[in-house]
Amino acid sequence: MPATSMHQEDKQSANGLNLSPLERIKIEKHYGGGATLAFISNQHDELAQVLSRADILKIASYDCAAQALQAVLDCGPMLGKRGFSRADIVRIAGNGGGAQALYSVLDVEPTLGKRGFSQVDVVKIAGGGAQALHTVLEIGPTLGERGFSRGDIVTIAGNNGGAQALQAVLELEPTLRERGFNQADIVKIAGNGGGAQALQAVLDVEPALGKRGFSRVDIAKIAGGGAQALQAVLGLEPTLRKRGFHPTDIIKIAGNNGGAQALQAVLDLELMLRERGFSQADIVKMASNIGGAQALQAVLNLEPALCERGFSQPDIVKMAGNSGGAQALQAVLDLELAFRERGFSQADIVKMASNIGGAQALQAVLELEPALHERGFSQANIVKMAGNSGGAQALQAVLDLELVFRERGFSQPEIVEMAGNIGGAQALHTVLDLELAFRERGVRQADIVKIVGNNGGAQALQAVFELEPTLRERGFNQATIVKIAANGGGAQALYSVLDVEPTLDKRGFSRVDIVKIAGGGAQALHTAFELEPTLRKRGFNPTDIVKIAGNKGGAQALQAVLELEPALRERGFNQATIVKMAGNAGGAQALYSVLDVEPALRERGFSQPEIVKIAGNIGGAQALHTVLELEPTLHKRGFNPTDIVKIAGNSGGAQALQAVLELEPAFRERGFGQPDIVKMASNIGGAQALQAVLELEPALRERGFSQPDIVEMAGNIGGAQALQAVLELEPAFRERGFSQSDIVKIAGNIGGAQALQAVLELEPTLRESDFRQADIVNIAGNDGSTQALKAVIEHGPRLRQRGFNRASIVKIAGNSGGAQALQAVLKHGPTLDERGFNLTNIVKIAGNGGGAQALKAVIEHGPTLQQRGFNLTDIVEMAGKGGGAQALKAVLEHGPTLRQRGFNLIDIVEMASNTGGAQALKTVLEHGPTLRQRDLSLIDIVEIASNGGAQALKAVLKYGPVLMQAGRSNEEIVHVAARRGGAGRIRKMVALLLERQ
């Protein structure tokens, strides 16, 4: 059984599994549990040859598990010969009816293989049991004739009751089509446990729900909670509406297993939760998961005790707001003191508890942490691996497999990255099974880590292994295949690319577009395929469609755009703003919420651009509703609309606003000003950053960090992790001679925590290559610096051979996107050299944020610009600033019109040769005529655009008349605006005038 045999390090001792009391109870409570324990005891040696301890426990946690374990021993060798990995076999066996499923896989897999189903498909279908496998064999061809793809059939079949769901689709699909449900909707409804009943219930209740304003998309989502959920919405929706819950909330709560019970619990418990200070958003979050009803009850029971231990309400909401939230809260209460004794912070405990299986993860950390520490894993690593669904299994797998990974050349950070996602345990096993074969195909270790380092990484790796040759034949290169696979649901996306790529290609979508849409998953590809003709008729171009589809929930976002676009147009939203709001994860919900709350926000003084900014991020729907709820209180506390928009207008904006409301008094007591609070809250993860500052600030102060230092480190994406990393790693940095300002510079960027870790790891190697400490800090002190440091080590020697010195390499690497810039220099340097650009030119172009894109733009547009009279110096000047690529494109696009309006080449170069040059040119094009009517000369406009930029031009346009009425001359206005920060200077002039009046 070569594919499933264990490595020597993985084998269990012959003394048995040494089950803990908790593990024994977990097995015994299942039907046939006693027989399972006896089987494990009697057959331990045989099982240990093919399964790890974690595998045995997984299979044993179901009814009749003894038969499933016996089936593994019987079928495992043959399945191994057919190419099934150990993880596949465990997955098939680890369900109710696992024994029959294994025997059926042996029976039907050859036929399914001939019909185009992959091994990944077979494993997934087997999750619906033996009957599902046989039903796919029987009615799969008919469903195929009706237009259902192989991926659709697998999705429907691979759940409890999959066989019945397939039969129901066959029977009910024509009627559902008549009612306006498309193929994607039908697959979504059927593709859950109890899918057959859900399809029937949709037919029964859809007319009534439709009359109440629920869309087809809404009904399909509610059906994810099963037939009962649909009936519950019908019964309870009027009362919930009276209590202030809007349709989006109701859909969210109902659309999960147990959705009916969750809706009832919200109705029963909402008033008590409100009395305790929980907001409507909190209640919705806790209720909107499997077991939501139990979670709400547990919060009511346990919240006082958790608050006494120092957990905040946001912490409690976060821990309760996942499947199994009730158990997680109880586990935190039981185990928190033991964690504190071992040095885990409150933030660590919350992170580990706040996932599916959080209770088991906490238990596993307590049990395995000493052994992991002995192997060199830090507390931060342990928290990262445990802090995902399936964290307990991931920790056990790391302990079992780490030595083998080390022998194969994987570093500790790579092991942590692969293990630190949903399904991390399976990912590690799959890498061990397939890594050698990938190496033979030329796939780099970094690519393997990238593919596996996402939710569902094991399946993605398996799919790449199987489909890569076919994708290569279609023209996809290794980089694009890795990119498609390296997202949650990567396996399904790869299969869908094969299905729909030929047609999308004919419709004008490029390979790059298809890869981007695949970032929204398989469903996004199929929905783009289905809706693109209609969206085109409405004026949306392929770029718009790609932007909307290429995110989580992209399929739903496309549907929502189709449904809501007319209503949004009536409200004054244009196509660009609709695309912006829809073009993020959760875009569909954002559009619905804009329609819902926009009038109320307008009454409160929020402009359309501000509403778009709040809505146009991940979680935009929640952010809009939270602004509506909290704005009056925040306003009373001195936060103005600009502050609120800034905080809310990021992914996680709703949570950030909630955190500001709760934590602001404590910050004020510690001397933080309002701008400090806004800066820390106004990033992705702002809520966590605020919490981390309150928790860690005293310790950081003791180490000599000032309040501005703390704000700078916390005020970026990942600020909470950066502060934690500074606290943990600062002594090591001090020992190596880094100053406090060095540490702050490295930590004070996106990904600061990873940058600190990378510096400690890579600094010795960089020193050997003659890079100084100042160089290392310079490279590390930017967004994306971890990759930049690694790229310097990887590409530095070749760049040196081509004549680039140390200072040049540091300049190129020491900007946002430095890693990509170094790679671009290697790739495009020879071509640029042939075209007359010297090394100094190349360094200037590449040595800015977005340097890689600038180099590509020079290659692409340089010849045309030269034909239009621009020389090499002009091109270097325009490309060699942040946003250089956009500047070159803008010159190419707008140059002829600007020439017609009297601007010469020197003017255009001057305006384009600054950060934001593209925007400056567009603004001159748009507003230049108006400014000319106000007696500003071409020279004035060029002066303002090339120094103050687009914002300064707009400020002059807006406030110029006011200033002129007050007696200020054009000459004075131009003098103030034509400087860096000119827009702010103009606004200050106006403010001073108003104060005097």
Curated annotation (Swiss-Prot):
BuD domain: where is this region? 84-967
The alphabetized UniProt keywords are: ANK repeat, DNA-binding, Plasmid, Repeat
Cryptic repeat - repeat spans: 19-50
Keyword Iron-sulfur assigned: no
> Where would you find the membrane-spanning parts of this chain?
none
- Physiological role: Binds to DNA in a sequence-specific manner.
Instruction: State the family named in the UniProt similarity comment for this chain.
Output: Belongs to the transcription activator-like effector (TALE) family. Bat subfamily.
Miscellaneous remark of the record: DNA binding experiments were performed with a construct missing repeat 11.
Q: Quote the entry's note on domains.
A: The protein is composed of 27 tandem core repeats (the BuD domain) with 1 base-specifying residue (BSR, residue 13), which recognizes 1 base pair in the target DNA.
* Name of the molecule in the record: Burkholderia TALE-like protein 2
**Species name for this entry?**
Mycetohabitans rhizoxinica (strain DSM 19002 / CIP 109453 / HKI 454)
